[in-house]
Structures are given as structure tokens and as C-alpha cells.
């Protein structure tokens, strides 16, 4: 499914409007203890060449043996992408030379991938959703890593990554802006994490993006694309697209022709640079790997894996809307991270109760999320427990504390009494809100008596009521029930 560019998504050039066309190839490292064709560990961060088998090093006579878990993870991912699962696929040799590719070829899948066409629903904004088509998903080996900063006179090779299983997920050219591309990668990463087939840690190289960018006049055929290799953050993906699109528009408007090539994004300089001319499939001389039989399984195998899938983000979002009455936006924010979604449900249901789901969502997506972001964690990774949030919400709901006092209690939970029950904090520190109407009436009378000029202003301009509320709250140390204060002031001021 191809989206049609909205006028707001067109880029203005010196000679008119242009449309960006974006497709992506995502390389997702498969979550597996061992590599695709060997038993070597996939652990990240080991000493150079600590996790290398004879197969990974391409020693003569060593034959590859397929890792069944990697196959299962690819099928699970295909199911999560609503894609066609191919019951027969073939591994091919992709021939090219590079120092960190010891075999002289990469084992990949060309004509017969394990997963065919699928689709991903992507929320670009609270009011816009697009469908991005998936062209294919195939399994392949990762290469090693060349190290150029260990010696002044030579380059070294680390083969720890050599042979690690990758899923290459190829999208159709259905994206029309950097915002759409960022949202697509974010959604795809969420799906992979829910399934457990890739941890999605871009900073460790577990998820890398090759971004294909072209530009055209609206309504014209597709332009010549350039591939930006190995973009390693969602923010950089957006920047790379913007920079490359502007570069191509400049070439066209200067009367030149965009050359099909592979480019590198330099975030420091804010530019893309040419690496090499873009290879075509025939340049790699693909042919079936003679050391590996075709990969075949039956529908029962696929059905078994499908039955074991967790609830995926879209289904969870719809359930949160239906079961908890959440707005679509709140539900989308919560399900974007599986652990946060689980945390939310644990807080709502803590102690066997079912407290106000919207109030819990407000706290998790508001103050708690703000704290988590400030320390670089997700909500679920903080020390604040679901039970503590449940207790805090209960105190607000039953009128024990106001929302303002609740913020103070949360601050205490964050900085001081990290394991405390909010109820205990409220009792120990005397933070119960004042609900006694007599005490509130006395505070209101005192403020009115001290500010006769403000009384006249408020009676002429009711919006002044907020000033009086603030003064009463200040006098009561923020403990007065805000609604009771409002009601008392309106009665006394006659507004």
C-alpha cells in the first residue's frame, strides 16, 4: 500500500515542490544464544575474537548448520508483521570481498526468502496513521568488524559479530517524510521487542537501518534512489533523510542527474557523503549455497509458533481502549513499550482492586514518565513500583490528598523514601488535605477580609477567582481540598 503525499509533506525547492520517497532495509539482530550457523556465543561486548568458531572464521572443511531458534524467530517476526510465511526458502551465497568477511561471501536469502509481503500500521501523529508495506524478510549472516583505531599502521579484524543471525526487513517505498520514517522504525522496533526476536538496541548495533531516499515532482515516476548505510539512531534517520533529500533537490535544480549510489551520513557535519556506486543484484553473483539444503517446514509448525505469540502492540492498544476506556493517544503511549504496558496493568489491578484506569494512565504518562526520561530509563525500569502508584492514585481518588500534594509525595518517593508506601508518607508528614468545611471557610474569610479591592475585581471579572484559590491554598500549605475552596469562594463572593 503506497501513501499519497499530503501538500504539507512536500518540500519546496527553488523551482517548485518535490516529494520524498523513502524505503528502508532494517537489519535486526536475532535474539539467540548462538549464531546462525555455529554454536558460538552472540554475547555483546566480549574481548575481540572471543566468540569465534571455526565456522565463523571460515576454516577449510567447516560446514554451516542452521540454528533452529533463529528460524523460529524469523517466522514469529513475519507473523507479527502480518506477512506471508514461506514454507520453503533457500539460502544463497552473496559474493563480495571485504576484510571482515572471512568466507569471501555472505550467506543470505535472495530469490526465496523465509517471509514474504506484509504490512505495518504506523501512527505518525495522534491524528494520522499510515500503512507501510513489507516487501520481504530474510535471514542472513552478519559480517565481522574492522578496527582502524587500535594501531597507527594497520587495521585489525574482530570476528565476534561474524555469523551472528540477522533478519533483513525490507519495506516498500511507502514513506513520504522523515517523520513517517522515524515512526515506522519506532513501531517496527516495538513489534520486535514484544515478540522477543530482537532487543532493538541501536546503540549496540542490534538494529541498523539502510535508508533509501529519492525525490520527484508530485505525480512523476520514482526518481533515482540513494542508499544511506548503517544509520544507527532514530534521530539520525530523520536527519539523514532531510539532508539527502535537500542534496538531491539541489542536484536536480542545478540541472544535474542524481547518481544511484551508497552514501554515508555524517551527523557531525550534517551531510551525506558518497561511499561507492550502488551495486545491483547481479554484481553479487548470487547462487544457492551448496552446503545448505532448502529450508522447509509445514503449516503446523507455523501455527504452533503463532499460538505462542504474545499480545502484540496493536491488539493491546485496542484492548486498553475497550477495557480501560483510555483515549487512543494514551493507549498508544503506554503500549509503545511492553514493560510499561505491563506496569500500567499491574498498577491498575494492584491488590485485586480496579482503580481509575485513566488516572493511573495520567500519572504514568505524565509525572512518572517525566522522571523516567530525566534519568534515561523507561517507567518500568525506575525504582517506583506499580503498587506505589496504585496507592498514590487511591489516595487521590478517596480525597485523602489532592493532585498537588500527590506530586509532593511522588517527589519524596523519588528522592528520599524510595521503598515507602505513599499512605505512610502522607500520615507521617501530615499531608492529608483539609476537607473540614469550617477550616476552609475560615481561611476564605481571612483572605477576603485582607483583600477588599480584589473582591470587587473578582465580582466584576470572575476569572480572578483563581487568584483567591491560590491564596487560600498558600495559607493552608497546599492541603485544602481545591474543589471545596472553589465552592466556598463562589458562595462568599457571589459569583
UniProtKB/Swiss-Prot annotation:
EC number assigned by the record: 6.3.5.-
Subunit structure: Heterotrimer of A, B and C subunits.
Organism: Methylocella silvestris (strain DSM 15510 / CIP 108128 / LMG 27833 / NCIMB 13906 / BL2)
Gene name, Swiss-Prot/TrEMBL: gatB
Top-level taxonomic group: Bacteria
Similarity comment text for this entry: Belongs to the GatB/GatE family. GatB subfamily.
Keywords: ATP-binding, Ligase, Nucleotide-binding, Protein biosynthesis
Catalytic activity, as annotated: L-glutamyl-tRNA(Gln) + L-glutamine + ATP + H2O = L-glutaminyl-tRNA(Gln) + L-glutamate + ADP + phosphate + H(+); L-aspartyl-tRNA(Asn) + L-glutamine + ATP + H2O = L-asparaginyl-tRNA(Asn) + L-glutamate + ADP + phosphate + 2 H(+)
Annotated HAMAP family: GatB
Chain ranges passing through the membrane: none
Function: Allows the formation of correctly charged Asn-tRNA(Asn) or Gln-tRNA(Gln) through the transamidation of misacylated Asp-tRNA(Asn) or Glu-tRNA(Gln) in organisms which lack either or both of asparaginyl-tRNA or glutaminyl-tRNA synthetases. The reaction takes place in the presence of glutamine and ATP through an activated phospho-Asp-tRNA(Asn) or phospho-Glu-tRNA(Gln).
InterPro entries linked to this entry: Asn/Gln-tRNA_amidoTrfase_suB/E (IPR017959), Asn/Gln-tRNA_Trfase_suB/E_cat (IPR006075), Asn/Gln_amidotransferase (IPR018027), Asn/Gln_tRNA_amidoTrase-B-like (IPR003789), GatB (IPR004413), GatB_C_1 (IPR042114), GatB_Yqey_C_2 (IPR023168), Gln-tRNA_amidoTrfase_suB_CS (IPR017958)
Alphabetical list of SMART domains matching this protein: GatB_Yqey
Stated name of the protein: Aspartyl/glutamyl-tRNA(Asn/Gln) amidotransferase subunit B
GO terms assigned for molecular function: asparaginyl-tRNA synthase (glutamine-hydrolyzing) activity; ATP binding; glutaminyl-tRNA synthase (glutamine-hydrolyzing) activity
One Pfam family matching this protein: GatB_Yqey
GO biological process: glutaminyl-tRNAGln biosynthesis via transamidation; translation
Amino acid at each position: 500500500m503506497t501513501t499519497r503525499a499530503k501538500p504539507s509533506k512536500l518540500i519546496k525547492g527553488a523551482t517548485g515542490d518535490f516529494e520524498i520517497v523513502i524505503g528502508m532495509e532494517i537489519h535486526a539482530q536475532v535474539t539467540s544464544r548462538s549464531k546462525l550457523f555455529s554454536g558460538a556465543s552472540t554475547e555483546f561486548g566480549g574481548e575481540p575474537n572471543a566468540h569465534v568458531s571455526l565456522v565463523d572464521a571460515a576454516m577449510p572443511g567447516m560446514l554451516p548448520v542452521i540454528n533452529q531458534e533463529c528460524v523460529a524467530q524469523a517466522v514469529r517476526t513475519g507473523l507479527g508483521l502480518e506477512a506471508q510465511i514461506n514454507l520453503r526458502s533457500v539460502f544463497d551465497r552473496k559474493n563480495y570481498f571485504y576484510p571482515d568477511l572471512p568466507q569471501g561471501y555472505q550467506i543470505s536469502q535472495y530469490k526465496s526468502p523465509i517471509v514474504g509481503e506484509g504490512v505495518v500500521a504506523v501512527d505518525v501523529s495522534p491524528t494520522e496513521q499510515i500503512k507501510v508495506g513489507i516487501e520481504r524478510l530474510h535471514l542472513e549472516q552478519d559480517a565481522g568488524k574492522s578496527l582502524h583505531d587500535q594501531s597507527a599502521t594497520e587495521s585489525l579484524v574482530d570476528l565476534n559479530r561474524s555469523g551472528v543471525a540477522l533478519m533483513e526487513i525490507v519495506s516498500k517505498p511507502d514513506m513520504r517524510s522523515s517523520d513517517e520514517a522515524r515512526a515506522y522504525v519506532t513501531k517496527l522496533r516495538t513489534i520486535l521487542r514484544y515478540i522477543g526476536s530482537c532487543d532493538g538496541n541501536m546503540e549496540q548495533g542490534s538494529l541498523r537501518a539502510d535508508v533509501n531516499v529519492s525525490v520527484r515532482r508530485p505525480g512523476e515516476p520514482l526518481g533515482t534512489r540513494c542508499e544511506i548505510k548503517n544509520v544507527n539512531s532514530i534521530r539520525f534517520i530523520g536527519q539523514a533523510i532531510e539532508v539527502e533529500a535537500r542534496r538531491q533537490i539541489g542536484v536536480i535544480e542545478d540541472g544535474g542527474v542524481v547518481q544511484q549510489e551508497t552514501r554515508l551520513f555524517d551527523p557531525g557535519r550534517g551531510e551525506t557523503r558518497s561511499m561507492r556506486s550502488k551495486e545491483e543484484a547481479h554484481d553479487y553473483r548470487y547462487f544457492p549455497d551448496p552446503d545448505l539444503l532448502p529450508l522447509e517446514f509445514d503449516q503446523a509448525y507455523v501455527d504452533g509458533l503463532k499460538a505462542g505469540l504474545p499480545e502484540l502492540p496493536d491488539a493491546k492498544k485496542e484492548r486498553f481502549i475497550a477495557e480501560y476506556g483510555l483515549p487512543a493517544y494514551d493507549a498508544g503511549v503506554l503500549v509503545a513499550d511492553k514493560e510499561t504496558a505491563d506496569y500500567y496493568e499491574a498498577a491498575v489491578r494492584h491488590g485485586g482492586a480496579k482503580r481509575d484506569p485513566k488516572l493511573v494512565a495520567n500519572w504514568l504518562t505524565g509525572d512518572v514518565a517525566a522522571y523516567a526520561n530525566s534519568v534515561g530509563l523507561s517507567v518500568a525500569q525506575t525504582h517506583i513500583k506499580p503498587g506505589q502508584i496504585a496507592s498514590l492514585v487511591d489516595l487521590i481518588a478517596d480525597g485523602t490528598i489532592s493532585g498537588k500534594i500527590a506530586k509532593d509525595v511522588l517527589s519524596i518517593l523519588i528522592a528520599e523514601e524510595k521503598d515507602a508506601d505513599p499512605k505512610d508518607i502522607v500520615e507521617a508528614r501530615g499531608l492529608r488535605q483539609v476537607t473540614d468545611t469550617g477550616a476552609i471557610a475560615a481561611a476564605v474569610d481571612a483572605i477576603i477580609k485582607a483583600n477588599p479591592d480584589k473582591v470587587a475585581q473578582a465580582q466584576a471579572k470572575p476569572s480572578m477567582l483563581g487568584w483567591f484559590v491560590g491564596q487560600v491554598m498558600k495559607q493552608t500549605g497546599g492541603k485544602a481540598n481545591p474543589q471545596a475552596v472553589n465552592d466556598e469562594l463562589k458562595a462568599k463572593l457571589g459569583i
